[in-house]
């Protein structure tokens, strides 16, 4: 099997999922820390979007970033953010409202269905699958299939974009929130 590292979406596709306008407030949230705290930004963004969807009153994005950083990025003595770190931060915030974070190793199995239901999803990109982002967390809000059947995601990237397009084959896991 030959790993294809470069992927580019060079055709017009039909994006499905949440309205792009829902992501506009997040354009101002750029992760400038070194090392980055992308898991915290993704979890906070997902929380704001789900709070709006579910009618739950939670904290502001700024308050969430402050509060979640310690529980996601620094709770355990290693560098980097694994899915269980993001999951822990989300569960800490959402358990009081009767919600739980779910996880699937293969994002392409769950993301289209969740987005059809209006549920945004945190996905992890990985260097092992050729992602130019290396290991990074994004919030996916739209998906599309190209003419060859390849699945693509449109996402909030906390490096400053709300319209990042990535191929699903460069992601390894998905996290989302559901009512218990």
Labelled PLM ranges:
Residues 65-180:
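Conserved active-site-adjacent core of cysteine acyl-enzyme catalytic domains
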């Amino acid at each position: 099997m030959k790993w294809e590292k470069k992927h580019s979406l060079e055709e017009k596709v039909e994006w499905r999922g949440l309205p792009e306008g829902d992501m506009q407030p997040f354009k101002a949230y750029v992760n400038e820390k070194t090392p980055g705290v992308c898991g915290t930004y993704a979890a906070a963004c997902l929380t704001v979007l789900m709070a709006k969807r579910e009618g739950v009153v939670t904290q502001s994005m700024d308050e969430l970033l402050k509060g979640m950083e310690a529980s996601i990025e620094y709770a355990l003595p290693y560098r980097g953010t694994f899915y269980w770190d993001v999951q822990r931060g989300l569960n800490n915030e959402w358990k009081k409202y009767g919600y739980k974070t779910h996880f699937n190793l293969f994002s392409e199995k769950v993301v289209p269905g969740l987005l059809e239901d209006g549920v945004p999803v945190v996905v992890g990109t990985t260097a092992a699958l050729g992602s130019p982002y290396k290991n990074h967390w994004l919030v996916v809000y739209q998906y599309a299939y190209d003419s060859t059947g390849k699945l693509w995601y449109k996402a909030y990237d906390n490096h400053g974009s709300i319209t990042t397009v990535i191929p699903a084959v460069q992601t390894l896991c998905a996290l989302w929130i559901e009512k218990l």
